[in-house]
């Protein structure tokens, strides 16, 4: 189930065994340690920036579903793409069905997608024509095509969340002004459902 070494597998088996979903919880935005979250750097956010992400950011989780930044979580390891059969479901996508989509889309019908494909497909396949699901991609141009690299994309996603919080972005067009890590908006590779930034 976990693609990891024995030490990490034992740690997470113990976490699930001893899990308490009601006490000792940590805000979700401070709990995740991946590159994307390191580049969001919520520890240095102002109160105004923290309020912004609480109102605008949704965190997708294979275990919890949709989290807001200050929702309390306990340590766990369960990727959305995990082949975990549950009663009547062959994997977590089938288990969650359209519940994540319903939660994310409920406010205004516009989603700026900064999730990896593994997570975003739990929402994108349910999007209706009247709704906007805009995927943001980061990469380098090679032979007229944009090539994405996993590590760089994770860092850039986190930087964009931070940029949006720092600048209190409410207008989609303002996202195009993102100029971090040498990235610039690439209109020639973008369309109404995709914003592409290249170096």
Describe the predicted segments one by one.
Residues 1-44:
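Active-site helix-to-loop segments that bind/position phosphate- or nucleotide-bearing substrates
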Residues 42-191:
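Internal, well-folded beta-alpha domain core
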């Amino acid at each position: 189930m976990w693609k990891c070494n024995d030490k990490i597998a034992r740690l997470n088996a113990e976490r699930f065994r001893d899990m308490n979903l009601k006490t000792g919880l940590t805000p979700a935005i401070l709990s995740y340690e991946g590159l994307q979250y390191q580049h969001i750097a919520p520890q240095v956010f102002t109160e105004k920036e923290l309020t912004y992400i609480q109102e605008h950011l949704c965190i997708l989780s294979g275990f919890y579903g949709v989290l807001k930044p200050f929702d309390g979580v306990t340590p766990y390891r369960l990727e959305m793409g995990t082949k975990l059969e549950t009663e009547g479901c062959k994997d977590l996508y089938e288990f969650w069905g359209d519940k994540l989509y319903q939660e994310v889309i409920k406010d205004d019908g516009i989603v700026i997608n900064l999730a990896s494909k593994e997570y975003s497909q739990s929402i994108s396949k349910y999007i209706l024509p009247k709704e906007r699901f805009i995927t943001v991609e980061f990469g380098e141009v090679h032979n007229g095509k944009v090539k994405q690299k996993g590590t760089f994309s994770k860092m850039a996603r986190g930087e964009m969340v931070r940029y949006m919080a720092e600048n209190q972005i409410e207008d989609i067009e303002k996202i195009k002004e993102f100029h971090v890590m040498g990235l610039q908006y690439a209109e020639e590779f973008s369309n109404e459902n995709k914003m592409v930034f290249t170096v």
